[in-house]
């Protein structure tokens, strides 16, 4: 089975203001538990960007606990790790862009949303649960799907689940399913993604 997810942001404390967790440890452990309860060792997961927050070392102790065959489509917070090449320990492929077939459905994968009206679906991350200008645009593009954990119950989801969760988010039904984080007004993102910063993908080390 194929699953999709994005914007985990392991170890990133500022996101607590827009997520329903009291601590980074609670957030990280919930994301890992939800992942492993959903994904079997034989399943495939496309992580559409933003493992953590682009600084220091790769979060090895967290990535090593995630099950399944994993593929990373890099986000703007996946390019600045001091040991970025070590990501190949956990991901079978690392790209900035990918195209796959999920059954008979064609899928375009990129961290940033792309206007897409062709066959299949475009799956992205980056915008979290933002209700900014992009919300009004993307709600008119039902083939462009947000895989971010913030609107997908903090777990990887299938294409069918992704379609339904996005429909609920852009129709307003999602607001009744997931309450806003404490001290955050409903519909207020509280944090805006950084400007995209593309850097070369590190070469796969010999032997990995």
List the model feature ranges, each with a label.
Residues 1-22, 41, 146-208:
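Acidic, histidine-bearing metal-coordination/catalytic regions of metal-dependent phosphoesterases
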Residues 3-101:
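Core catalytic region of metal-dependent phosphoesterases/phosphodiesterases
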Residues 57, 61, 129, 133-136, ...:
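Residue-identity detector for glutamine
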Residues 87-179, 184:
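Conserved beta-sheet core of the metallophosphoesterase superfamily
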